[in-house]
Amino acid sequence: MFGYGLVIPHWGTIVVGDSNRIGNYCVLHTSTCITDNKKEIGDALYVSAGSIITSKITLGNNVSIGAKSLVNKSFNNGNILLTGSPASIKKQRPAWYIEEGKSHKERVFAIEKLKASLQ
């Protein structure tokens, strides 16, 4: 299950198991796979092309995954970039919508403001 604000910017094969819980503002690029196994994934996940998330794991908020990486263990900290096979923390990184530019950041903040006003 995905939260709101899912972005799939390119056409291509994307496989996601149905027992996973994935937060808001997730971005999935072409040729990515998030296998089944009840993963718990926070908000603002960014999965680059060719990456795989496998095993029963947990990922924190604002996790970016580099191209062709294999994530097979939990990373509970947020604001990180994972790369490699198996993946490891490459560096600290803000949420993708902050890193990618002002228009993305403004859109996310506008949605959150609207959501708060409706509650």
Per-segment meaning from a language model:
Residues 37-119:
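Glycine-rich hexapeptide-repeat left-handed beta-helix
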Residues 7-8, 27, 46, 64:
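N-terminal alpha-helical segment
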Residues 1-25, 31-40, 51:
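Left-handed beta-helix
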